[in-house]
């Protein structure tokens, strides 16, 4: 004597995820029988290319005024110092991106995004109001760490 469940319960059980299973919540994930949940469609290389372009464009906007300050400070070695700064930026980005990414997975993305944006923007007015020329170094580290979050 076997008792079969009604067909409505079978369909409901088949559509629900197993206990403990996490439904996909990332951008571009598609739920069964629905349209795209978030974002502009499935992830593609073009989305990454836009983000990379914006990062280098923003860094270029900061490099132009920084060259003026570098020329005033190191008149004989302006481009050498710019290359050194760019190299340190790349190294710090390489080291900080996985660390900040892992921490943001644990504590959430919003606090890290807000923090990196704040620490990226905070030193720029200080460069303008400071009587000494030490502040030109300040945007390098936060900009390096902050730009890799996006």
UniProtKB/Swiss-Prot annotation:
Q: What is its main location?
A: membrane
- Location relative to the cell: Membrane
Tagged with keyword Membrane: yes
Q: Name one GO cellular component term.
A: membrane
Per the record, what ranges lie on the membrane's Cytoplasmic side? 71-82, 133-150
Transmembrane spans: 50-70, 83-103, 112-132
Give ranges for the Extracellular compartment: 1-49, 104-111
Top-level taxonomic group? Eukaryota
What's in the keyword line of the UniProt record?
Membrane, Transmembrane, Transmembrane helix, Transport
**Region Disordered, annotated ranges:** 1-25
Q: Does the keyword Transmembrane apply?
A: yes
Instruction: Give the bilayer topology.
Output: Multi-pass membrane protein
One Pfam family of this chain: MFS_1
GO molecular-function terms, A-Z: transmembrane transporter activity
The family note in this entry says:
Belongs to the major facilitator superfamily.
Protein name, as recorded: Major facilitator superfamily domain-containing 14C pseudogene
Source species: Homo sapiens (Human)
Gene that encodes the chain: MFSD14CP
